[in-house]
């Protein structure tokens, strides 16, 4: 896990937490803190948000099944896929592959966002009072809390 400053001028976040290795379907799944970060973002966003779009609540329920365990399992992959399916409705170029890759900026193609950058942006929107101090969230995993002072 590391911080990145996006180059894109319209970025919804000025800085975001990036993963070092891919997480999800056919991914590296090498770093527990990367997996924890993706799981934490998915779960907290799903717990804090509601959906009014058709199919949105079913996707939210799939994301709520994601454990915050640091192990990439079928529920984590399905949660990533559910997130991407929902975002594809708004950003048609979003790739739905059940995988979060390390981002090189916010967008990978016009209107297609890196999953990890998008998760950062929505988390920031939902929790503006603590952003970027993830460690202040009551459900932040201990491994993430321990790592953040080195990054911020």
List the model feature ranges, each with a label:
Residues 1-152:
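Cell-envelope/ECM-targeting effectors and their regulatory/trafficking segments
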